[in-house]
Amino acid sequence: MENTSSSREQKNKRKYKKTTIISVLLAILLFCGFGYGTYVYMKTSNLVQKSNVNLARGEKSNLREETVKPITNNVSLLIMGIDENQERQKEYNGAFHTDALLLATFNKDDKTVKLTSIPRDTYTYVPVEKKKDKITHAYGSGFVKNGKDGGPQASVEAVEKLLQVPVDYFVKFNFNSFTKIVDGLDGIEVDVPVEFTEQNSKDEPDAIHLKKGLQKLTGEEALALARTRHIDSDAMRGQRQQLVIEAILSKLKSVGSITKLEKIVEAVDGDFKTNLAMDDILSFYKYGLNCSIEKIQLAGDDLYL
C-alpha cells in the first residue's frame, strides 16, 4: 500500500511539475506578446508624433461648427501623394506637386467609405495663390509661402474650396514611403486595366512594364500604375489610383502579423506627414475592417489651358 501511495504521489508531483512548466511557458509567451505589442504601439506613437503637422487653421475645419472625431462622427481624410524623390530635391527645392489627391469620407451609420479622386490638373481656385490654377500646384505654392508645413495646409484649403466639404484629416506620402508600404505588405493584388510602360520612382525611363490583368504588384509597380498618365486621360489616372488605394486598404484588413505592421511603421519613418493622432489612426483602422468602399470620380472635361 505504501509503495502504491508513494508511486501515486510521484506521478502527481511530475504532473504538477509539467503543468507548472507549461503555465510558466504560456505566461512568458503571453508576456512577450504583450510586451512586443506594446513596443510596436509605442514605436508607432513616436513616429506619428514626430510626423505630426498642426495645420494653421487648428484642429477644426473652417467648414465645421465643432471638432469631430473618427467613429464618433462622420469625418473626411485627404490622401496626398507628392512627387518627391531624391532626384527631384534640387529641381523642386521642396515645392513639390500632388501627384495623387483622394478624399475619403467615412459614414459611421452605414459603414461606408466614399473615395473621391481629384485629377491633378483640376483647374480651380487655389486660396494660397488667390487665383485659379491647377490644384496640383497648391502644395508647392503653400510650401513657398509658408514653409514646409504650408504645403498640406494649402492642399487642404484648395480641396475644401473645390468640393465645399470639410477636410478633417490628411496624410501625405512621397514616392519612397509609398513603395515601402506596399512592399511591407508583401505586395498588393490589382486587376491592372491596361498594359503600359512607365518610369520608376527614380525617374528612370521605361523601367516598369505591366501587362493587363489581375496580378500581384510590388511597391515600384504599384507606384507606376498610380502615376502613369500619358496613356489616356487624367480622369482614368484617378481611377487607377483608386484601384491601388482600395487594394492597399484590402491588404491592411488582412494583415494579421504584428511584425508586418512594424515593417510598415519603419517604412514611412520620416517620409510622411499627418495631423492624425495615434488614437485617431487606430479608430480609422477599426472602422476600415468592416466598411465597404464606393469609388467616385469628379465630372469634367480634359482641356488644355
Q: Which residues does each PLM region occupy?
A:
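Non-catalytic, solvent-exposed segments at the cell envelope interface
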Residues: 2-27, 31-305
